[in-house]
Amino acid sequence: MNNKTFIDNLKELTEPIVNDLDYELYYLEFVNENKENYLRIYIDSESGIGLEDCEKVSRAVSAMLDEKDPIDTSYYLEVSSPGLERQLYDDKHIEDNIGKTACVRLESLFNGGRKFEGKLKSFDNENLTLEINAEDFKIPRKKIKRINLIYEG
């Protein structure tokens, strides 16, 4: 099973549990760091996420994982909020944050830079538009490595 299929399977098993507890499954990843495997589940809600929320989801997901046993290796389960300076992984995340300030990091140089900060203005299949110093700045999406919100307190 390739990694995308593996992740999709985990999402399919996890999302209904998270939703039943009145949270949104923001993102899920399975990573290897320092020779240890981690299943990281990021949850969100309109009212924010606290430690109790993470514990509740962790208990429910852990019970399902014990029952279904979809992961054939040892791992640690981590449940957390995506945070105030959250990474935007997909179109829904970008759409939900139009008008907010973000940092866009690129794979390679573009217009003399690899990092741009500005207000998320719009996006389509080809470009992401930031408003930087009251000017629209289009960045080709294929060059984008990562987008994070910038907390403005």
Curated annotation (Swiss-Prot):
One of its GO terms (cellular component) is cytosol. GO terms for biological process: ribosomal small subunit assembly; translation. It is found in: Cytoplasm. Gene3D superfamilies: Ribosome maturation factor RimP, C-terminal domain, RimP-like superfamily, N-terminal. Pfam families: DUF150_C (PF17384), RimP_N (PF02576). The keyword Cytoplasm applies. Keywords: Cytoplasm, Ribosome biogenesis. Transmembrane segments: none annotated. Coiled coil: none annotated. It comes from the Bacteria. Required for maturation of 30S ribosomal subunits. PANTHER family: RIBOSOME MATURATION FACTOR RIMP (PTHR33867:SF1). Belongs to the RimP family. This is Ribosome maturation factor RimP. It comes from Clostridium tetani (strain Massachusetts / E88).
